[in-house]
Amino acid sequence: MSQLTHINAAGEAHMVDVSAKAETVREARAEAFVTMRSETLAMIVDGKHHKGDVFATARIAGIQAAKRTWELIPLCHPLLLSKVEIQLQAEPEHNRVRIESLCRLTGKTGVEMEALTAASVAALTIYDMCKAVQKDMVIGPVRLLAKSGGKSGDFKVDAHD
């Protein structure tokens, strides 16, 4: 079984020293969902929200969140991200919005937390913008879809999950 990397021999939380690691291209993708009533989704898709373009605002929020993950999650390293991409797609057949984030860099540590934070904050932004018309929207699940680069190897969610 793998060991927790943020816990030292004394059982204390600490920031992992990555100074000896080689720089490699690292990438991670994550997804989040916001489920809502069909009327709320139609309002977003039709561009009829009085606050403006919900998808554009959520996209910017997700990008900003990825860039600031190190300020939000204790023990995360500040990273020089080379790419953050947020895709939002209405899924009317499920009354939800699917958010997928992609983060990439050339560096010494992975970008999984940045991808997860980006997708999560984009989802929270959709909730924030639409809560006046629907308070019982549901956020989730949020999950890592894939990661590549680094010594722990690649990871990809099973296509059937």
UniProtKB/Swiss-Prot annotation:
Q: In which pathway does it act?
A: Cofactor biosynthesis; molybdopterin biosynthesis
Name the EC number(s): 4.6.1.17
* EC class (word): lyase
Q: What keywords tag this UniProt record?
A: Lyase, Molybdenum cofactor biosynthesis
User: What biological processes does GO assign it?
Assistant: Mo-molybdopterin cofactor biosynthetic process
Q: Which Gene3D superfamilies match?
A: Molybdopterin cofactor biosynthesis C (MoaC) domain
* Binding residues for substrate: 75-77, 113-114
Reaction it catalyzes: (8S)-3',8-cyclo-7,8-dihydroguanosine 5'-triphosphate = cyclic pyranopterin phosphate + diphosphate
List the active-site residues: 128
Name the InterPro entries on file.
Answer: MoaC, MoaC_bact/euk, MoaC_sf, MoCo_biosynth_MoaA/MoaC, Mopterin_CF_biosynth-C_dom
Instruction: Name a Pfam family for this protein.
Output: MoaC
Record-annotated disulphide pairs: none
The protein's GO terms of the molecular function aspect are: cyclic pyranopterin monophosphate synthase activity
Mind telling me which NCBIfam families this protein's record contains?
moaC, PRK09364.1
Belongs to which family? Belongs to the MoaC family.
Tell me how this protein assembles: Homohexamer; trimer of dimers.
Q: What does this protein do?
A: Catalyzes the conversion of (8S)-3',8-cyclo-7,8-dihydroguanosine 5'-triphosphate to cyclic pyranopterin monophosphate (cPMP).
Name it. Answer: Cyclic pyranopterin monophosphate synthase
Protein's gene: moaC
